[in-house]
Regions:
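Flexible, active-site-adjacent loop/turn segments at secondary-structure boundaries
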Residues: 12, 38-39
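Active-site cradle of extracellular carbohydrate-active enzymes
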Residues: 3-18
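Flexible glycine/proline-rich, aromatic-decorated loop/lid segments
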Residues: 14-28
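Short beta-alpha junction loops
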Residues: 2-3, 116
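Active-site-proximal substrate-binding groove within the catalytic cores of carbohydrate-active enzymes
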Residues: 22-25, 34, 40-266
């Protein structure tokens, strides 16, 4: 875990001149997270700090195979009007992408919080890519019918771990992991209680049950991780029964009403 956006005033390297500045000259600040008061580091500076930190880690004989640059893919692009390093939102994405590209150049697999189309060329995996309703307290009414739009385009491009919570006897997130051909989360703890889709009132499963469920999702992911998702449908027009088809011929049908699934080969 590492990140190059939240710019904490307590950091030895903090310099207000490198923070994102608005056109009126003000600098957005808050103290929502555990690091205390902060602003936002202008992304024009992020590649420098990424290279500095990972070079120092390497000097200590630590050989990393993967790194998680937090928040880059879950937050909108920043703008900066500091005349020394002005930046548009598009340029912000480009500078964030350079950070991922640097990791790749060092043989380090880059990851970030969610998935975004601008990051696809240089992102190998992510923290998660949940449907919108999964971020809300279980039982909150869904806004429409969730469908795998992102994976219909980018399934074979990014490894996506999925929530595996059984939130009630009528809702099991494992079914969405299977439908999307994703990787499973065996254990997923949020940084803070009841945030990022991590709630405490789910159905309690034994560790053995969690492992068995994860094995089922893992076996499917081994088959289809590098395959395109070619097709998604609501079977016979029933949105509670959905089916996806992958480019190797693997099909997955889930019945959200019965809480069941089938994996087959076409």
């Amino acid at each position: 875990h590492d990140q190059y956006r939240d710019f904490y005033k307590a950091a030895p390297s903090f310099d207000e001149n490198y923070a994102c500045r608005l056109p009126d000259g003000s600098i957005p600040e808050h103290q929502r997270w555990a690091g205390g008061p902060q602003s936002y580091l202008c992304a024009t500076q992020a590649p420098y700090y990424v290279k500095r930190n990972f070079t120092e880690i390497k000097k200590h004989g630590i050989r990393l195979d993967g790194a998680y640059l937090d928040v880059f893919t879950c937050n909108e692009g920043d703008e900066c009007d500091n005349p020394e390093h002005r930046m548009t939102r598009r340029e912000c994405y480009e500078f964030r992408g350079r950070c991922f590209e640097y990791l790749l150049s060092q043989g380090i697999l880059p990851s970030s919080e969610e998935v975004s189309d601008w990051a696809v060329p240089s992102l190998v995996f992510c923290h998660y890519a949940p449907y919108d309703f999964m971020m809300k307290k279980p039982g909150t009414p869904k806004e429409g019918v969730p469908v795998p739009l992102y994976n219909l385009v980018y399934h074979d491009c990014v490894i996506q771990p999925w929530m595996m919570d059984k939130v009630s006897e009528a809702e099991d997130y494992m079914l969405y992991a299977l439908l999307n051909g994703g990787a499973p989360y065996l254990i997923r703890d949020a940084a803070y209680p009841n945030i990022d889709g991590a709630f405490d009132d789910n159905v309690t499963l034994s560790r053995k049950e969690e492992i068995e469920r994860s094995k089922a999702v893992t076996e499917l992911h081994k088959q289809v991780a590098k395959c395109e998702m070619l097709h998604h449908e609501m079977v016979n027009g029933d949105y509670m029964v959905q089916e996806t088809t992958f480019s190797d011929g693997t099909g997955v049908r889930v019945d959200f009403r019965k809480q069941t699934y089938q994996i087959f080969h076409k």
